[in-house]
């Protein structure tokens, strides 16, 4: 355990005590009770292989392709942390007992991440370690994987250093891989594992389009963009 880092984290927690927007009542609030139960339940599980973290329900779509593949091709249990109490993952979990969802608000998430114990943590949130969300102080061999939101340039859309503390990045294509490699050379950063895995959202759009009925129009249309 990195005790110096833990001591520093106490100061950081005090400095960001108002994080998370509107304040909730701590006593008698059903979300507070639910959060405490899920926090305790998460740490009661040993040997967690894969943990996903989602900021809200809308981010599930970036993980969907990976999660569905793991469920279909492995026996891995998916531990899914979300800061959205209405996240669709809770409904999905009712039909698949290998999905274990947990509601953890933004404040309690800080300490949960500091105490994280898992083989792999998958996130779509940049700036790991740069701000309030840290790598685990308990376990140093966790592999942190970053999943991009889109297919565009990471250099043009991300802050400098926003991926420096991830171990792996699932790149949507060759252009993202080359950008990261050149950034690592320019700033003398440790090399990450860069996986060219594509973009599952585009795959799903193509499948949906193939299912649609198509009829060619005799009148040509011009799209100006």
PLM regions and their residue ranges:
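Generic low-polarity alpha-helical segments
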Residues: 1-5, 12, 70, 174, ...
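Generic surface-pattern signal
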Residues: 11, 18, 185, 210-214
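Nucleotide-sugar donor-binding and catalytic loop/hinge architecture
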Residues: 38-48, 207-225
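Active-site and donor-binding regions of nucleotide-sugar-utilizing enzymes
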Residues: 51-206
